[in-house]
């Protein structure tokens, strides 16, 4: 079993630290300072970095980390080739911490965005899926992002999902506006408000939970997904 910890960074980012024993893998380091502090505090060995896409709030920590760890294995799609020395393609399989890690095509937010699924248990999805929401489609390729969400929906419902941003409360306000009232939505919103009032993360979430409260996962076709995304962009 892995120990997975969110490292808060910037205004609302989470850098995920995946730990096994004294080794750690870092996902999307937006800032090197909190990563290095976490490693030092817990006396860990940094063994690899996973990058989901090329936005600066997911990669700005890379120059400093590579200067400290020049031999580090860095996995990512071609769009992060300036940092990654192990370029991944959709449906590649990696072995990390004795887990089979599947690389899932997740384009739309960026052209080559990927997600990493550890053994049908843990999904690190960058900016594709958030609790109660999904990422903006900066490429304009709504089909690609809709398809990515369909791939996620096909996973086991117990999969834990680790998005890269704390957007839950604002996303749930939108969900409340567009979905029929439900006990699940009310309870999850109440829980999220309590957690944030204590400055605690609302993440990870689960696929089971998101299927109940995420309007983008409930979109039945591409047209409905596009309409929802446009609504959210102007919400």
UniProtKB/Swiss-Prot annotation:
Cofactors (names): Zn(2+)
Pathway: Secondary metabolite metabolism; methylglyoxal degradation; (R)-lactate from methylglyoxal: step 2/2
Gene3D superfamilies, alphabetized: Ribonuclease Z/Hydroxyacylglutathione hydrolase-like
InterPro entries reported in the protein's UniProt record: Clx_II_MBL (IPR035680), Glyoxalase_II_hydrolase (IPR050110), HAGH_C (IPR032282), Hydroxyacylglutathione_Hdrlase (IPR017782), Metallo-B-lactamas (IPR001279), RibonucZ/Hydroxyglut_hydro (IPR036866)
Keyword Cell cycle among UniProt keywords: no
Enzyme class, first EC level, given as a word: hydrolase
Keywords: Hydrolase, Metal-binding, Zinc
GO biological process per UniProt: methylglyoxal catabolic process to D-lactate via S-lactoyl-glutathione
Binding residues annotated for Zn(2+) 1, in chain numbering: 53, 55, 109, 127
Cofactor note: Binds 2 Zn(2+) ions per subunit.
Subunit structure: Monomer.
Family from the record: Belongs to the metallo-beta-lactamase superfamily. Glyoxalase II family.
Family matches, as HAMAP family: Glyoxalase_2
Name recorded for this polypeptide: Hydroxyacylglutathione hydrolase
Organism this protein belongs to: Actinobacillus pleuropneumoniae serotype 3 (strain JL03)
Lineage: Bacteria, Pseudomonadati, Pseudomonadota, Gammaproteobacteria, Pasteurellales
Encoding gene, per UniProt annotation: gloB
